[in-house]
């Protein structure tokens, strides 16, 4: 028998690229228009400070746990270690759900970008768009199935390529910036004075899209088992966050100094493409368009890797049946990749009948991943409290509390209704979790406590279905 070669390890640069690439997808290119629809520049800046601080607390929590618990693999492992296997399943299944729903958003906005070059794709939700998106989805699945580490190496190159249009846009934004235009309605009223109630409402309205663009910051943690050094995953999370925050603030705020808020809010999506076209002429639209396409393909590549890796790790830890962890000669989780791609395909075909596919998919994506983030913060609190006498753990306890409070506020602002819809997708997952328990010698399909939580999830799912049927949630 031939001895298997050990899997190649991913270095720090590739891990940082994974964090940046998995977060910079479609969101940053439409960020200005989405924010201008919700807020003036003053509240936007305050919201960035709040979201940046909250995400930093999450990143520091991840970094601390990676250092303190180096044997754990994957973001859901913290929930399992701190609160039991069912919590680990809830976290892992939610992360997997978030990842492939994110791929659906990439498909819809990619078709919009292609529509700038080829009018047949402009509607984003016609049959040609869905067919092309389907081919891309299965092609990326095939590529990742050829080897996860190989995909990560190419991801480093893709990240460099897609940052160039963003940096060029930021440079022109600085050069063409008009201070008087930026400050004339800084707080979104005629006197441009600070009015607390109005400002707080604007901050709340733009929090959702800001949290969406940070989805993926934990990417290095998910592949920490394959890092050359365990510490690299934590460093990549922090460095990736700092880079992302700088890019997002500049890309979203500078256009307020070039066009009025009303003009920005009414501009077509992808907003950055059309803003840059106004700045420099027709070539600007093509330049940003190519960058957007590369950006989405890079993020889509990352999020093809991550959900499959999640299923693989969950199967290894007996949270899913063993067949979810089957790998090929390249060490890629083939079964998990095919299952995930199949679900994406089903969702893509539903785009023929939905009206707000992009918003619906990214709202579900954000709501489901916030659950994972909450459990990370909760375990950070539990671990720090249990080791309170060790150096630095009082500060880590505070970091965990702040991260948890931020995520709770996030789920409330993201919309509890979308979380209830996510519960629908948990029901088949709970079946697989129960089968894994039985396969590993447990007498009962679920424990009493797990049945109680399952009942709550089912009730929540029924409420979610009612919200859709009654028209309170538009899909």
UniProtKB/Swiss-Prot annotation:
The chain crosses the membrane at residues 10-30, 42-62, 74-94, 101-121, 157-177, 205-225, 238-258, 283-303, 333-353, 361-381, 397-417, 451-471. GO terms for molecular function: arginine:ornithine antiporter activity. It is found in: Cell membrane. Keywords: Amino-acid transport, Antiport, Cell membrane, Membrane, Transmembrane, Transmembrane helix, Transport. GO terms for cellular component: plasma membrane. Belongs to the amino acid-polyamine-organocation (APC) superfamily. Basic amino acid/polyamine antiporter (APA) (TC 2.A.3.2) family. It comes from Latilactobacillus sakei. Catalyzes electroneutral exchange between L-arginine and L-ornithine. InterPro entries: AA/rel_permease1, Amino_acid_antiprt, APC_superfamily, Arg/Orn_antiprt_ArcD. This is Arginine/ornithine antiporter. It catalyses: L-ornithine(in) + L-arginine(out) = L-ornithine(out) + L-arginine(in). One of its GO terms (biological process) is arginine catabolic process. Pfam families: AA_permease_2. Its main location: membrane. The keyword Transcription regulation does not apply. It is a multi-pass membrane protein.
């Amino acid at each position: 028998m031939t001895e298997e070669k050990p899997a190649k390890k991913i270095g720090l640069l590739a891990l940082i690229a994974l964090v940046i690439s998995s977060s910079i997808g479609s969101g940053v290119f439409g960020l200005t228009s989405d924010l201008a629809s919700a807020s003036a520049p003053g509240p936007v800046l305050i919201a960035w400070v709040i979201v940046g601080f909250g995400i930093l607390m999450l990143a520091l929590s991840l970094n601390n746990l990676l250092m303190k618990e180096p044997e754990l693999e994957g973001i859901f492992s913290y929930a399992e270690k701190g609160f039991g296997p069912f919590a680990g399943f809830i976290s892992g299944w939610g992360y997997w759900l978030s990842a492939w729903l994110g791929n659906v958003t990439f498909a819809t906005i990619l078709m919009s970008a292609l529509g700038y070059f080829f009018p047949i794709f402009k509607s984003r939700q016609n049959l040609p768009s869905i067919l092309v998106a389907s081919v891309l989805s299965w092609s990326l699945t095939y590529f990742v199935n050829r080897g996860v580490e190989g995909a990560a190496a190419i991801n480093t190159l893709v990240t460099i390529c897609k940052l160039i249009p963003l940096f060029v846009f930021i440079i022109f934004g600085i050069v063409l910036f008009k201070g008087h235009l930026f400050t004339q309605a800084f707080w979104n009223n005629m006197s441009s004075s600070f009015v607390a109630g109005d400002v707080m409402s604007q901050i709340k309205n733009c929090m959702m899209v800001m949290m969406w663009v940070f989805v993926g910051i934990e990417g290095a943690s998910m592949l920490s088992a394959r890092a050359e050094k365990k510490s690299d995953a934590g460093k990549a999370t922090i460095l990736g966050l700092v880079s992302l925050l700088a890019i997002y603030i500049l890309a979203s705020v500078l256009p307020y100094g070039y066009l009025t808020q009303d003009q920005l809010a009414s501009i077509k999506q992808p907003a950055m493409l059309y803003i840059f076209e106004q700045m420099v002429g027709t070539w600007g639209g093509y330049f940003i368009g190519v960058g957007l396409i590369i950006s989405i393909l890079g993020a889509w590549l990352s999020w093809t890797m991550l959900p499959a890796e999640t299923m693989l790790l969950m199967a290894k830890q007996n949270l899913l049946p063993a067949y979810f962890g089957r790998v090929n000669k390249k060490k890629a989780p083939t079964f998990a990749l095919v299952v995930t791609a199949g679900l994406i395909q089903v969702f893509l075909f539903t785009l023929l009948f939905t009206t707000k596919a992009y918003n619906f998919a990214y709202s579900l994506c954000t709501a489901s991943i916030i659950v994972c983030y909450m459990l990370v913060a909760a375990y950070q609190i539990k671990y720090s409290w249990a080791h309170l006498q060790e150096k630095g753990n009082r500060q880590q306890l505070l970091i965990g509390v702040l991260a948890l409070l931020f995520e709770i506020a996030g789920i409330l602002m993201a919309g509890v209704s979308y979380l209830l819809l996510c519960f629908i997708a948990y029901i088949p997952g709970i079946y697989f979790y129960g089968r894994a328990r039985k396969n590993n010698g447990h007498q009962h399909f679920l424990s009493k406590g797990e049945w109680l939580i399952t009942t709550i999830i089912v009730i929540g799912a029924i409420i979610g279905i009612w919200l859709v049927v009654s028209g309170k949630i538009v899909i």
